[in-house]
Structure formats: structure tokens, C-alpha cells
């Protein structure tokens, strides 16, 4: 058994004590990489580096981690089997599932989310390719910091989570930091009136926590899907988006699939941006079609929300209703501003119901939202807006 432990935190720990990260992976290379990355961050420390899920379950109460990076495929006890045991022992443990990009692992990751995992991250096929390793590092550290900080903020009411949006180290692509409003300041956010034009298309952007939020929302908007097209960008890699589309189809009981280049956009369908490509909208013969873009990441994301939002204006002008759900970063803010400038409207998920209030917080803080609502109120509000309500 390969086990490395850090000292347990003091009972009278400071408010901004570094996040304690438990790394659980049977690959010594992956454990070593993640350990070095975490230890290089001033606001994190490696609480334990473990080889199996059984090690994690047995050591959990001793090492007291805030965040666990949990591999799926391990000997003795795999990640999906260890997950419920870990959460039974420590309900507020933030678990980030890590897996390679296979359909089986993607399906297991979705199951893990339903069992209480906070998020997932795809591991690169090889750590020898610098860009892949850099992206994995950037995404993992951001998830640890944002999700760990979110739990701490909930534990201390009225206290903003430390350093959620800051980027202390250079990233391979720019990813602007965004100040995250607290719940207390949310009531003071400036809200606009809904646009004068009745919406003709629904656009949705989401990231961390998005799969669960999307499945909840699409189950509430059946009447809208029946009469109007719905286009979604969820930050997610290939294979994962294929499975997410299947889940959305089941949740909504309507057709849902990854967008296809040149495909006509029609009412009655949910179109999901495929992993690894931006989904834009274009006109062909005067009709809206899907346009896939294999260009560089936008806002450090591919697919990104902004390309969808901004391209849709060329087709529907002010007849757009955009919804920004839970997620890290600020993707969707620039596109949201452009939608409002064109006469459309934007709704953001509120902080209390978001896993991470980065993306929705960014659009809300930018003053472009007509409403900032709990997740369970967004679907019904969308139905009313498409039925003609402009209030």
C-alpha cells in the first residue's frame, strides 16, 4: 500500500487555512503530478496521497480532507464504490471524479454525480504532451479551489470563499478572473426589464454542476421545447456530451442530441454542443443551421458559451432568451451583454442553488440579467416568457 499523509489540521484552524486535498489514484505518476501541483499552490496542501479507494475510506477520518480527487478505476475498491462510503463518513467532502475519456468511464462519472460527487475531470491519455498536461492542471486546480471554497463559504455564513476566482499561475490560454458576489449582495444587483420581443429560441450555458441543473430544467420546459428550438453549451469533453444528450432526452422526453454541422435547427429539439467543438449558429438559405467550430478555446473552454450566444444574434436578433446556469469562470458574460444589446433577455441562476456561482454571477454582476432565480423557478419562468409574459 502506497500512502503519504499530511498532519491533521488543528481544531482551532484559521479561517483561511489551506484546502486539504486527498489524492486517490493507483497511478504513481498521476499521484506525483497532482501532488506537486497542489503543493505549489499557496492555498492548498496535500492531505494524503493514496493508491486505492479502500485506503481512502480507511484514512478519511484521520487525514480530514476538504477535497478528494478520486480515480474511477483502482484495485481493491474502485472510485464509484468508494464514493458513497466516503460521503457517509464526511458529508461535506468535495469529491472530484477523475477518469480517462472512455464511454464506460463517462457513464460512471454521470452515476457518480447522482451519488453526490461534486464534479468530474477527464485525465489526459498521456502526461507527456505539454498542452494536455497544462489544461488538466489548470482545470483541476480551478475545480479544487472553487468547489472547496464554495463549501467553506456555506460553512461560514456571510463570509466570501477565499480566492475562488483568482488565477495565481500563468495558464496556457487567458482565463479572466471574475469577482463572485455573495448571497448578501445579490439583492442589490441591477436587473433589466425583459426585452420587448417575444423569444423565438432558448439558449442555455452551463459548466460545473450543469448536468444536474440541465436535467432538472429541461424536465420543466416541455411546452417550450415543443414549439421552439433549444440550444445548449455545457463545458464538457467528447464522449461525455454524447451521454449528457441521452440523459437530457430522457429527462425532457423530447429529442436531444449533439449538434451536427449544417443541421437545420427546428422546434421540438434540444441541440447540445459536442465536446471539443464550439457550436455556433449560421443561416443557410435563410434558415438557421448548426455550425461547428474547431478553433481554439474561448474563455479557456471548448465548447464555450460565448460563441453560441454571440452567433445566435445574427439569426434571431432580439428574439433570444438566454439562461446561464451554474459554472466556474465568466463564459457567457460577453455573449449575454451582446444579446441584451440586441434586444434579447438573460436569466441567471442564483448563488444559493448554484454549485459554483461563477458564470451566472458574472452575468448578474455585469447588470445584464432580467432575473436571477433559484434553479427550480427558472423552468416555470421560461415557460411563461415563451407564452407571452414579459414581466
Swiss-Prot record:
Keywords: Chemotaxis, Cytoplasm, Hydrolase, Phosphoprotein
Record domain Response regulatory: where: 20-138
Cell compartment(s), UniProt: Cytoplasm
EC number: 3.1.1.61, 3.5.1.44
GO CC terms in record: cytoplasm
GO function term, MF aspect, one: phosphorelay response regulator activity
UniProt-annotated catalytic positions: 207, 235, 331
Family: Belongs to the CheB family.
The protein's name in its UniProt record: Protein-glutamate methylesterase/protein-glutamine glutaminase of group 2 operon
Annotated source species: Rhodopseudomonas palustris (strain ATCC BAA-98 / CGA009)
Amino acid at each position: 500500500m502506497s500512502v503519504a499523509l499530511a498532519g491533521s489540521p488543528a481544531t482551532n484552524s484559521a479561517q483561511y487555512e489551506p484546502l486539504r486535498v486527498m489524492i486517490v489514484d493507483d497511478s504513481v505518476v498521476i499521484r506525483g503530478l497532482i501532488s506537486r501541483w497542489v503543493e505549489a499552490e499557496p492555498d492548498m496542501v496535500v492531505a494524503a496521497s493514496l493508491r486505492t479507494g479502500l485506503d481512502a475510506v480507511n484514512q478519511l477520518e484521520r487525514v480530514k480532507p476538504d477535497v478528494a480527487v478520486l480515480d474511477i478505476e483502482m484495485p481493491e475498491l474502485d472510485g464509484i464504490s468508494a464514493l458513497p462510503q466516503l460521503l457517509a463518513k464526511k458529508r461535506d467532502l468535495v469529491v472530484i471524479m477523475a477518469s480517462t475519456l472512455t464511454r464506460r468511464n463517462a457513464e460512471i462519472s454521470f452515476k457518480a454525480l447522482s451519488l453526490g460527487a461534486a464534479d468530474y475531470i477527464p485525465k489526459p491519455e498521456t502526461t507527456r504532451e505539454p498542452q494536455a498536461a497544462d489544461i488538466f492542471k489548470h482545470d483541476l486546480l480551478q475545480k479544487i479551489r472553487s468547489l472547496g471554497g464554495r463549501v467553506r463559504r456555506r460553512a461560514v455564513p456571510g463570509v466570501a470563499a477565499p480566492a475562488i476566482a483568482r488565477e495565481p499561475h500563468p495558464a496556457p490560454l487567458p482565463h479572466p478572473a471574475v469577482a463572485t458576489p455573495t448571497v448578501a449582495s445579490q439583492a442589490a444587483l441591477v436587473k433589466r426589464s425583459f426585452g420587448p420581443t417575444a423569444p423565438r429560441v432558448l439558449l442555455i450555458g452551463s459548466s460545473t454542476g450543469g448536468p444536474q441543473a440541465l436535467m432538472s430544467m429541461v424536465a420543466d420546459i416541455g411546452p417550450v421545447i415543443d414549439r421552439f428550438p433549444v440550444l445548449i453549451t455545457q463545458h464538457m469533453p467528447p464522449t461525455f456530451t454524447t451521454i449528457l444528450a441521452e440523459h437530457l432526452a430522457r429527462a425532457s422526453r423530447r429529442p436531444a442530441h449533439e449538434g451536427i454541422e449544417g443541421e437545420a435547427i427546428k422546434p421540438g429539439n434540444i441541440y447540445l454542443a459536442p465536446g471539443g467543438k464550439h457550436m455556433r449558429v449560421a443561416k443557410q438559405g435563410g434558415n438557421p443551421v448548426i455550425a461547428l467550430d474547431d478553433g481554439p478555446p474561448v474563455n479557456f473552454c471548448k465548447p464555450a458559451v460565448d460563441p453560441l450566444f454571440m452567433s445566435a444574434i445574427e439569426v434571431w436578433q432580439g428574439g433570444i432568451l438566454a439562461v446561464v446556469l451554474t459554472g466556474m469562470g465568466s463564459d457567457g458574460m460577453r455573449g449575454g451583454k451582446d444579446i441584451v444589446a440586441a434586444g434579447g433577455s438573460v436569466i441567471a441562476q442564483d448563488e444559493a442553488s448554484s454549485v459554483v456561482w461563477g458564470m451566472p454571477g458574472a452575468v448578474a454582476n455585469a447588470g445584464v440579467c432580467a432575473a436571477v432565480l433559484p434553479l427550480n423557478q427558472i423552468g416555470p419562468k421560461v415557460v411563461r416568457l415563451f407564452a407571452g409574459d414579459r414581466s
